[in-house]
């Protein structure tokens, strides 16, 4: 089946660059505002986003995406990729934007929490710019032709802290180590903290590798 990407447009920004990246790759993609009732034509799903965890979850909940992703998309076993904020929303809970200091429920597709980065060496937040990404020993189809230590483009202040270290497929370092790529491989759910669509040739390779993933 020819790849066709559903790109979730929940008003979280960063949509245009993802659409443009797949247009350049010649991959069919559709920017969808509300959850579709018929998903037969879609082979892959991308949840992009920038902004705060609380605002992101508010948007997904109000538009009906939260339940749809868990109840409709996830059971199909088709690949799902979160990018930047989209990766963070895959977590069980997060603290960004909480007025009470209590955690805010996330999609809970990958067990973990979103916490403020704590860089040492007087490094400022947000973490903006190119940084090296180091793959774990877990070999996955996502990392094909991507060497450990290659640079990707980041913009973030919060990071994904996995409950199970095996869900962290790659790390980077900004004064302290943090998760750069996470996954629950058994559910075909993937997340990248950096922006592959803004990471030039290697980012293009990652987006192609995602499209090559099959349903689990």
Swiss-Prot record:
One of its GO terms (molecular function) is lyase activity. PROSITE patterns: GATASE_TYPE_1. Keywords: Amino-acid biosynthesis, Cytoplasm, Glutamine amidotransferase, Histidine biosynthesis, Hydrolase, Lyase. The keyword Mitochondrion does not apply. Residues 4-216 form the Glutamine amidotransferase type-1 domain. The keyword tRNA processing does not apply. One of its GO terms (cellular component) is cytoplasm. HAMAP family: HisH. PANTHER family: IMIDAZOLE GLYCEROL PHOSPHATE SYNTHASE SUBUNIT HISH. This is Imidazole glycerol phosphate synthase subunit HisH 1.
């Amino acid at each position: 089946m020819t790849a066709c990407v559903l790109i979730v447009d929940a008003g979280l920004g960063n949509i245009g660059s993802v659409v443009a990246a797949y247009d350049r790759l010649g991959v069919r993609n559709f920017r969808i505002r509300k959850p579709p009732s018929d998903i037969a034509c879609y082979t892959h799903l991308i949840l992009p986003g920038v902004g705060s965890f609380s605002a992101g979850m508010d948007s997904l909940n109000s538009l009906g995406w939260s339940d749809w992703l868990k109840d409709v998309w996830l059971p199909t076993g088709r690949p799902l990729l979160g990018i930047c904020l989209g990766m963070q929303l895959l977590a069980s809970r997060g603290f960004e934007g909480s007025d009470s200091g209590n955690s805010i429920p996330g999609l809970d597709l990958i067990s973990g929490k979103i916490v403020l980065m704590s860089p040492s060496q007087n490094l400022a937040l947000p973490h903006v710019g190119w940084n090296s990404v180091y793959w774990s020993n877990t070999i996955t189809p996502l990392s094909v032709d991507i060497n450990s230590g290659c640079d990707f483009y980041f913009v973030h202040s919060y990071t994904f802290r996995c409950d199970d270290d095996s869900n962290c497929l790659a790390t980077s370092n900004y004064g302290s180590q943090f998760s750069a790529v996470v996954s629950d491989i058994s559910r075909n759910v993937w997340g990248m903290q950096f922006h592959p669509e803004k990471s030039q040739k290697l980012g293009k390779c990652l987006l192609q590798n995602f499209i090559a993933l099959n349903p689990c």
